[in-house]
Amino acid sequence: MKLLVTGAAGMLGREVVAAAERLGHEVAAWDLPECDLTDAGATLAAIRRLEPRAVVNCAAYTNVDAAEADEATATLVNGDAAGNVARACAAAGARLVHVSTDYVFDGSKREPWIESDATSPLGAYGRSKLHGEDLVRAELPDHAIVRTAWLFGPHGPNFVSTMLRLATERDEVQVVTDQVGSPTFAGHLAPALVDMAERTDTGIFHGAGAGSCSWYELTLEAYDAAGVACRVLPTTAEQFARPAPRPAYSVLGSEREHPITLPPWQEGVRAHLAALEEVPSR
């Protein structure tokens, strides 16, 4: 299958390209500056020219805190650009797998969020991603929107890698205990996205590491697996204020007949550590 991966130089995109190539697909890997997805005309022309069977859109503005001060850019990249890709896929007869986020939810539930739950993002990042979802649904029937959560991997900035770095610089760290989610290793999600590109079912899917934990528990697991001695002190989101609000509970579940099933998040942490050994510059 001819597969186009957008955002191919990013943390998730690189894993999707690798997974697709391992499976023997013909892969086109796009990222800036070769193709600017915010340019509707250029995106349409490029995808029509390539004629892929499917597109996996990993391109995104992912700085949750920075989005609060620059919502226009976040909306352009996460929203309008996603609509441009969907419109181009419709013209080219391609299926679209579009990656979204748990931050479309407000965190008010205390049980896993399913695909049909009402969305109500708390911040600019979540609003921008929800705008992208809306445009994809409006522009292209043959789509799969895959919401994931707390993504980490060796090829980009992420919470787990940051905490591992801090452990080499400090004797102790403070981490919040009152935000709970589904940590997801990019290397586990990527093959599921490639598989979704080959499927025919459409709509919204949730794809995240199995299980749940707080940021505090995730840090403890990472330090234990890495064998580091840095102390982890509990704190709260109120005490550890950040520019962007985050949902208190964004664990993802699924109501789909054929759900995306990923390994437990703890396995993802161990796989991440192993992958970091192969990417020493990270």
Predicted regions and their residues:
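NAD(P)H-binding glycine-rich loop region in Rossmannoid oxidoreductase-like domains
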Residues: 37-79, 90
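Mid/C-terminal beta-alpha module of Rossmann-like enzyme folds, strongest
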Residues: 192, 199-244, 248, 273, ...
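SDR active-site strand-loop-helix element
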Residues: 6, 30, 58-59, 96-101, ...
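N-terminal Rossmann NAD(P)H-binding glycine-rich loop of SDR-like oxidoreductase domains
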Residues: 2-22
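A short helix->loop->beta-strand "cap" motif at the edges of active sites that frequently abuts
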Residues: 92-94
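Catalytic helix-loop patch of NAD(P)-dependent Rossmann-fold dehydrogenases
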Residues: 69, 76, 81-84, 104-146, ...
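Adenosine-cofactor binding site in Rossmann-like domains, unifying the SAM/SAH pocket
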Residues: 21-45
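NAD(P)-dependent short-chain dehydrogenase/reductase
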Residues: 134-181, 187-188
